[in-house]
């Protein structure tokens, strides 16, 4: 069974993330959306809230699950029996950072590969940070996130 892990903070999960998740689910037998606790970020949603939102979004897909982790991603991948880390790329600037991470992960654990999926061009500018910034100033983010996330965000502001 081919297992892929799609890690991220997903704060909030965007339509760009969902596009990558759906496409990965067509390639891998099992996809684990792995929500990480990032101590360097001040999240809009708690870890539990992010997991709950993603669980509702992925409900129609039998081969996608959601989990959370902290620590080294490569250790988590080993623990889950995953041989692939899935990363979405929006721009060249994403590639530079993600390549460094992929090379470090390969050095730490050569049996786990990193696979890059190019973001659909309609989402190439989209990031959770930008969605939060627009929402902070009462801008309309309805085309960037699923309805359930939009509702959850409106309760936070």
Curated annotation (Swiss-Prot):
The keyword Cytoplasm applies. Pfam families: CTP_transf_like. CDD domains: PPAT. It catalyses: (R)-4'-phosphopantetheine + ATP + H(+) = 3'-dephospho-CoA + diphosphate. It is found in: Cytoplasm. Disulfide bonds: none annotated. One of its GO terms (biological process) is coenzyme A biosynthetic process. ATP binds at residues 9-10, 17, 88-90, 98, 123-129. InterPro entries: Cyt_trans-like, PPAT, Rossmann-like_a/b/a_fold. Gene3D superfamilies: HUPs. One of its GO terms (cellular component) is cytoplasm. GO terms for molecular function: ATP binding; pantetheine-phosphate adenylyltransferase activity. The record marks 17 as: Transition state stabilizer. Its main location: cytoplasm. Pathway: Cofactor biosynthesis; coenzyme A biosynthesis; CoA from (R)-pantothenate: step 4/5. The keyword Nucleotide-binding applies. Belongs to the bacterial CoaD family. HAMAP family: PPAT_bact. Reversibly transfers an adenylyl group from ATP to 4'-phosphopantetheine, yielding dephospho-CoA (dPCoA) and pyrophosphate. This is Phosphopantetheine adenylyltransferase. It comes from Alkaliphilus metalliredigens (strain QYMF). The lineage of its organism: Bacteria, Bacillati, Bacillota, Clostridia, Peptostreptococcales.
């Amino acid at each position: 069974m081919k297992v892929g892990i799609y890690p991220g903070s997903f704060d909030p999960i965007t339509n760009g993330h969902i596009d990558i998740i759906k496409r990965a689910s067509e390639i891998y037998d099992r996809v684990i959306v792995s929500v990480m606790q990032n101590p360097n970020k001040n999240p809009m949603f708690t870890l539990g809230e992010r997991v709950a939102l993603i669980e509702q979004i992925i409900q129609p897909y039998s081969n996608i699950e959601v989990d959370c982790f902290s620590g080294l991603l490569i250790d988590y991948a080993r623990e889950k029996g995953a041989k692939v880390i899935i990363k979405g790329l929006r721009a060249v600037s994403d590639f530079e950072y993600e390549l460094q991470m992929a090379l470090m992960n390969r050095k730490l654990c050569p049996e786990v590969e990193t696979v890059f999926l190019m973001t659909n061009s309609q989402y190439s500018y989209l990031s959770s940070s930008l969605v939060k910034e627009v929402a902070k100033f009462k801008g309309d983010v309805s085309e960037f996130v699923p309805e359930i996330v939009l509702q959850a965000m409106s309760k936070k502001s």
